[in-house]
Amino acid sequence: MQRRQLLQSMGGLAASTMPFSLAFAQTSALKISHQFPGGTIKEGDFRDRLVRNFAAEVEKRSKGAMKFEIYPGSSLMKTNAQFSSMRKGALDMALIPLSYAGGEVPELNIGLMPGLVVSYEQAYSWKTKPVGIELTRVLQEKGIVLISWIWQAGGVASRGKPVVEPEDAKGMKIRGGSREMDMILKDAGAAVVSLPSNEIYAAMQTGAMDAAMTSSTSFISFRLEEVAKALTTGRTGAYWFMFEPLMMSKAIFDKLPKDQRDMLMTVGAEMEKFALEAAKKDDIDVAAVYQKAGAKVVDLSDGTIKKWQDIARKTAWKDYGAKNEGCAKLLALAQQTL
């Protein structure tokens, strides 16, 4: 009995003298949270698939030194608790629409700014341009490391008539997805409803909401064709582009050895091609899903996108730029990419 206790205490002593980062890396499975429906590497919502692919690839390259636990469907914590939990080091990683954290960090509302991004090419160009470098810096300052850049176009699903032109929104109760989207809807005469995308179905089903803006992927994953009679797609262009990156707590990231940090960043960047292709595919697939369900499907013209953009310039952009110096700087840098 004494020999066993001695061995146990020696084992504990050995562990306590290990470099902290090595002990951390070898004993902790990193938890990744997101709000989207769970699936497999091959099937389901591409955001869940991306997280699973990312985890599998890092585990493989690290020869099992890094392991992950994935929690889809807000099964680990509430959707809106994820960002602040990462900042505190209480959650390791999450894939979140960035604008959900805009109440906590005003600069992050740029992640869903109406009409500021109008194409995938422009969206992904942010990463290497001054706006992306500044956004990455802001996030790091707030305790977050950006691992994968993920952008998605979106549209509007409606229980009644399609919402295409600004005047179509008048008198309707609509979910925009961000404070800034809500501002252009209010300007167009709509009443706004604020909730995460995983709560849209119930609100539309009960009639608490007439229409919702969200990504093409969420229109499919949350089966909104069951409660919608019309869909305005983003397949020909959109004024609704959502930045939904895979992020990591800087407190956790900084504890890892350099080779593991580098591996996370490398694999994260490699996932971006998959994200772009999957998002574009969903922009096309969503139209077929809704047509099959009997919904009226319409697209946006360049002229209509410009109308919404003009409203955004005088409302959402102006409001965002006036918030603080950081917002003004990001807005100016983003406009350089238009």
From Swiss-Prot:
Specify which residues bind malonate according to the UniProt entry for this protein. R47, Y100, R175, S197, T214, S215, S216, T217, S218, E244
- A GO CC annotation given for this chain: periplasmic space
Where is it predominantly found? periplasm
Q: Where in the cell is it found?
A: Periplasm
Biological process according to GO: C4-dicarboxylate transport; transmembrane transport
So which residues are the signal peptide here?
1-25
Q: Name one Pfam family in it.
A: DctP
Record key words, sorted = Periplasm, Signal, Transport
Xref: InterPro entries? DctP_fam, TRAP_DctP_sf
Q: Which CDD domains match?
A: PBP2_TRAP_SBP_like_4
For this protein, the record's PANTHER family field holds: C4-DICARBOXYLATE-BINDING PROTEIN DCTB (PTHR33376:SF7), PTHR33376
This molecule's function is given as: Solute-binding protein that binds malonate (in vitro). Probably part of a tripartite ATP-independent periplasmic (TRAP) transport system that mediates solute transport into the cytoplasm.
User: Subunit details for this protein?
Assistant: The complex is comprised of an extracytoplasmic solute-binding protein and a heteromeric permease formed by two transmembrane proteins.
Q: Which family does the record assign?
A: Belongs to the bacterial solute-binding protein 7 family.
Q: What is this protein called?
A: Solute-binding protein Rfer_1840
Which taxonomic lineage does the organism of this UniProt entry have? Bacteria, Pseudomonadati, Pseudomonadota, Betaproteobacteria, Burkholderiales
